[in-house]
C-alpha cells in the first residue's frame, strides 16, 4: 500500500516540509479516497514565507515591466500545455465534473493573459505645462508583500485572479490556499517556477485559522485579497483593515434569476439548470433563486423538474456526468438539514435530491433539489446553502420580482430572461447587484472586468480583476517638476 504523501509549503523557492506536526487529509469527494495530506502550518512558517517575500521584493520590484510580462507569457503557455492535467486535478480534489474544471482552467489562463498585459496596465498619467515650465505626472508602484486567501470551490481560477496580477505589478505574494483543495496550488507554483519566476516572489503556506490570523495581522503584509463565506469575509475585512492593510473580501451570494412571461422557456430552463446545479451549486455566481413572473410559474417549474430528472450524477471524471459531489460529507449533511428546514417552513419540495441513487454510496453526493412556493424570509431563501438546491419564488410582475431580489442581504449577481427592452432596462437600473445577466446562465465577467457585488457579498473598495485589480495591487506617486 502506497503511503499518502504530505504536501509541502513553498517558501523562498524551496519546497519545505511543515514542522507543525498538524495535518488534515484531502479526500476525493467522489470516492472518499485520500489523495494527500495537507499540513496545518504554524505562524512561524508563515513568518518565514513573508520574510522570503520581503527579501525577494527588493529585487523583483526593479525588474523591468516588459521582462515581468515575458515571464507571465511563458507561464500562460505552460498552463495551456498542462490544461488537461490541471483540469483533472481540479476534479480529483474538488469533485466538479471535468467539463466544469476544464472551463475553470480556461478562466485561470485568461487571468494570466490579462496580467501579461501589465506594460499597458501599469502606465501612469502626465500633464505637461500645468504652469510655465512645470509638468505633473502620476506613476504606479507596487505595494510590497501582499497575500491571498482562496476558497475550495475554484482552486484554479481564484488563485489566478490574485497572484499573477499582483506579481506582474511588481509585488511579491504569499498564498494560503484552501486546505480542502491544496494540491492544485502547489502545481501552479511549480509551473510558475518553470516559467522563470525568481525564488521568493511566490510563496505558498498551507494551513487554517492560525495562518489566516497571521496574514491578517502581519506588519509586513500590505494587502489581503480573500474569497469565501460571508462571516469569514467580514472578519477578514475588519481584522486586516484594523491592522492597516488594504483589503478586498469577496463573500457570499444568493443570486436571483427573474423569468418573465415572454421568456424563451427552453433557453431559460437550460440556463437555470446549468447555473443552479453546475459545479454542484458550489459557486458564488450560482443561481439559487428563480423568480417566476406571472402565469408561467407552473410550466416553468414542471420543465425545471423534468430537466433535473435527466441529470446524471456521479464521478466528475466519468463521461456523461453533469453533477458531481459536494466538497465534504459535512457539507452534504448541512445541505440535507436545509432541505428539512425548507419542508418544515412550508415550501413545496418538487424534487428531492436526497433520493437520488448516487447519494447512498461512497462520495459526498446530493442530487438536484427544487423547492416551489418559497417565500422571501424563509431560511432556504435567506441563507447561502452553496449546494444543488434551487428555490422558486412567484411574483405578480417585474416590480415585485425586483423588490424580492433586492430584499436579499447579498448582491453578487442577478439575471433576467426576457425579450423586452423595457424590462431589461428596468432590471439593469433597479436591481441591486454587481454582475447582471440578460438571457445568460452565469454573468461572471471576463478577467479584464471587475468581479463582485455589493452589500454582504463584498467588503472593500476595489474589486478583483480588471482595472480594479491593478488599482488594488499598486500605489500612486505624483511628481511635479520644474524645468529650468
Swiss-Prot record:
The keyword Cytoplasm does not apply. NAD(+) binds at residues 152, 176, 179-180, 229, 384. CDD domains: ALDH_F6_MMSDH. Disulfide bonds: none annotated. It comes from the Bacteria. The keyword Oxidoreductase applies. One of its GO terms (molecular function) is methylmalonate-semialdehyde dehydrogenase (acylating, NAD) activity. Pathway: Polyol metabolism; myo-inositol degradation into acetyl-CoA; acetyl-CoA from myo-inositol: step 7/7. GO terms for biological process: inositol catabolic process; thymine catabolic process; valine catabolic process. Homotetramer. This is Malonate-semialdehyde dehydrogenase 3.
